[in-house]
A protein has these predicted regions:
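Proteins enriched for Cys/Gly/acidic motifs involved in redox and nucleic-acid/cofactor modification
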Residues: 1-71, 83, 113, 128, ...
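A generic short-segment signal for beta-strand/edge and adjacent turn/coil regions
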Residues: 30, 95-100, 108, 219-226
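Contiguous mid-protein beta-loop-alpha structural module that forms a pocket-lining wall or clamp
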Residues: 179, 193-196
Length: 244
């Protein structure tokens, strides 16, 4: 593992804490490209964070391929020597950090303890970006995601209970193989009912060497585009409601 951080301006730095992924989502090439899940040592992360603070940078964004899996591979083993919650607590204790932001975290790895700590922390901003990909359990299973829609509902409710004004962003893929009109509308209605702030919408794109690329029931490109437009319109409404 190569410890690193980068700065794009004088106000924000991106602190990499983890790389790789052990998940087998059927649409994703990241495990092939980035390898197994592995983490920086906690002491290295803290040292990097302190170096960022010394540059008078006000915000740190935690990044990684699957940051909720932090701790796995930390010392060259498959064990979680430290947890993501350990990381969050250690960073919050550093003096001089104005804001800390979690870039994106899988819903099944976003634990109640982490949500509760962020809610009362001095440095973490009340912002969560939590990939969903589909509100249809049938499609989630075809994607080989590690949760179903009810778990996602529970995560959103837990965030809002701890931080009523929290901003919650969602990743969604439309046009995945097997996504019938019925399943898409199920996903659309699911998102309408969720107390979220914005959507990042992606039309499914076939990737070589993925299980999904050889699945049947391919959704036509024009249907993917139509569904993307619908969800982007919903995102505009969600964002307007959140900020109004």
């Amino acid at each position: 593992y190569t410890s690193s951080f980068s700065t794009n301006d004088r106000t924000r730095a991106f602190l990499k804490v983890q790389d790789g992924c052990d998940y087998k989502c059927t649409y994703c090439t990241i495990p092939l490209a980035r390898g197994i899940s592995r983490s920086d040592a906690l002491e290295n992360v803290i040292e990097n964070a302190k170096n960022i603070v010394a540059q008078d940078i006000k915000e740190i964004v935690l990044t990684g391929v699957n940051i909720g899996d932090f701790g796995k591979g930390e010392f060259g083993t498959k064990k979680h020597e430290h947890t993501f919650l350990d990381l969050v607590k250690a960073l919050d204790a550093i003096e001089g950090i104005s804001r800390i932001r979690i870039s994106s975290i899988e819903p099944n790895l976003l634990k109640d303890e982490t949500i509760a700590f962020v809610g009362q922390s001095k440095g973490f901003v009340p912002h969560f970006h939590v990939p969903l990909q589909s509100g249809s359990d049938i499609i989630l299973k075809r994607m080989r995601r590690r949760y179903l829609s009810q778990l996602y509902i529970d995560r959103v409710k837990a965030i809002k209970k701890a931080m009523p004004h929290a901003c919650i962003g969602v990743d969604v893929i439309v046009g995945f193989p097997g996504e019938t009109e019925e399943e898409f509308l199920k996903s659309y209605r699911f998102l309408v009912d969720l107390d979220i702030s914005y959507l990042h919408v992606f039309a499914y794109s076939e990737r070589p060497n993925t299980a999904a690329a050889s699945m049947g029931e391919v959704v036509p490109q024009h249907v993917r585009a139509k569904r993307s437009k619908m969800l982007r319109g919903l995102s505009v409404k969600k964002r307007h409601y959140f900020y109004s």
